Amino acid sequence: MKYKSIFKLCLLTTFLSVATISCDDWTEMEIHDSQVNGFKEQNPQEYAVYTQNLRAYKATKHAVVYARLDNAPEVSTSEKDFLRALPDIVDIVPMRNAARLSEYDREDMKLVREDYGTKVLYYIDCTAKDKLNTSITSAVETVRAGTFDGIALGSEGSAVDVSALKPLLDALGQTPCLLVFEGTPSLLPEAQRSLFNYFVLDISGASDEYDIETSVFYATGYGKAAPDRLLLAVTPVGT
């Protein structure tokens, strides 16, 4: 009995020694350089065909897909904070923090503009009166430089005075670009409405089809906007 106990103790000691050594081996980490290749790198030919067809589709008359991006957040929580995470089919994306583009933003903008044919816009908050002139100057400079495809104006439901629009339109001059207003057309001076390519109507608060029809009727009737210039939008819950 004594020998058996000693034998068992020896086995246990041996096991613990092996386990300790094994654990030491497991906790020794080695760092290896690795690169994750996407569709473009894995199959360049198929990628080229896909993106060519995508750009061709976006050049045709179709239902325009519009999505805002709160880029360059103070703290990034997931891929949703980056332009590359948006569906390829998106046509127009205003960058809500266009004044502070990150290097990731610039890389993603190059990708979606060149490969997907996506239009990326400089977003201006017209309610920030103290920053409006600076925003207009920066927006015009970046559009002229080719960094952005156009400008999106937001007013949070407030009317935009002609004094705010005139500096922007004068500075742009004949520069070809896309102009989008996030709001119903009647919030803009009537003389400047025709200069905008699209008006984004937020119908998040609509409770039924009647509310949506009323918003559209108000924009086309009182706002005098062509129906094909209206984009109906909703803000997803939880964003």
Locations of regions flagged by a protein language model:
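Bacterial Sec-dependent N-terminal signal peptides
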Residues: 1-59
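Chitinase-like catalytic core of GlcNAc-active glycosidases
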Residues: 59-239
